[in-house]
Curated annotation (Swiss-Prot):
This is Protein CsbA. Residues 23-27, 67-76 are cytoplasmic. It comes from the Bacteria. Keywords: Cell membrane, Membrane, Transmembrane, Transmembrane helix. It is a multi-pass membrane protein. The chain crosses the membrane at residues 6-22, 28-44, 50-66. Pfam families: DUF2198 (PF09964). The gene is csbA. It is found in: Cell membrane.
């Protein structure tokens, strides 16, 4: 359970960062990460709502981080 919680905190954040670097658009990256998370929920890899909540928090944090980076890049 602790391992899944740690992974739920880090992996969605890192996926948003990775997909943003690949697609050059943080909105697309958030959508791709959310789609992967939704597919894993449907497949049954999530046991508790606590893990789902951690996934959502990490996804939002990744989106906010990349939005901040995009704003910094526009200022340059």
């Amino acid at each position: 359970m602790i391992t899944k919680a740690v992974f739920a905190l880090f992996f969605p954040f890192m996926l948003v960062v990775l997909f943003t670097r690949v697609t050059f658009n943080h909105y697309v990256a958030i959508a791709l990460t959310a789609a992967l998370l939704f597919a894993s929920y449907l497949k049954g890899y999530t046991e508790t709502y606590f893990i789902v909540g951690l996934d959502v928090v990490s996804l939002v944090a990744g989106g906010l981080y990349m939005a901040k980076k995009a704003a910094e890049k526009k200022e340059e």
